[in-house]
Amino acid sequence: MDGIKKKMIAMKLEKENAMERAVQYEELLKKKEEEREKRENEISELNTKMKQAQIDCDEVQETLQEQMNKLEETEKRATNAEAQVAAMTRRIRLLEEDLEVSSSRLTETLTKLEEASKTAEESERGRKDLEIRSIADDERLNQLEDQQKEAKYIAEDADRKYDEAARKLAIAEVDFERAEARLEAAESKIVELEEELRVVGNNMKALEISEQESAQREESYEETIRDLTERLKAAEQRATEAERQVSKLQNEVDHLEDDLLAEKERYKALSGELDQTFAELTGY
């Protein structure tokens, strides 16, 4: 009986232990179930993430391809840009060389300008004139243009007058040569007439000896003498007229030469003034 009780107590204890283990197992099973559900949820989330990752990977691949294409285009543009840079470098080198030449010229110009400035500073009156001309430079330039036009007109008119004077001088030289020829002819004729008069005088002396015998011849000789005298007077008048004409032409030529010289001096002075004015304006 005691054995049965002990056995019953042992079985009861074992039952209680079994119940406790069952409860523990149920709790453990519940935990395992929860862990399983959690794992399944994690797996589902992982699957979702993997799908999204695949989508993202595809998008990344597409983006990568686009970036590769853009990279190729960029490399092409970079190659072209490098070629342009090389061309620009060569151009810059040429420009630098031109700049060196220009700088050298600029230095020379600045040196000349400095010398001109020093020269301008030496003259207070010139400086004031430059200041006045710089204030009214437009009006001065217009005046200079008018003066230049006037100088050009004067020069052209002087050239025309010179040509006209040269033409008149040539005509005068021809007339002078003709007058000299006529004068020489007149002088020769006068010599001939004097010789004839001398001969006539001798003849008159002979006629005086034989006046009665040569009365008619004397009248003829007197007529000849009168004719020769008139011819001599005419020759003298022509010679006088030729000398007067030559003197008149010479005076006219001298007058034209004086006018031409005056015009040239005026043109020279005006050109000098223009050159000086432009030089002062440039130096200023």
From Swiss-Prot:
Coiled coil is among the record's keywords: yes
Bilayer-crossing regions: none
Protein name as annotated: Tropomyosin
Known role: Tropomyosin, in association with the troponin complex, plays a central role in the calcium dependent regulation of muscle contraction.
Keyword Zinc-finger: no
Domain commentary: The molecule is in a coiled coil structure that is formed by 2 polypeptide chains. The sequence exhibits a prominent seven-residues periodicity.
Pfam families: Tropomyosin
Parts forming coiled coils: 1-284
Domain of life: Eukaryota
Family that this chain belongs to: Belongs to the tropomyosin family.
Region feature (Disordered): 111-131
Keyword annotations of the record: Coiled coil, Repeat
Complexes and interactors: Homodimer.
InterPro entries: Tropomyosin
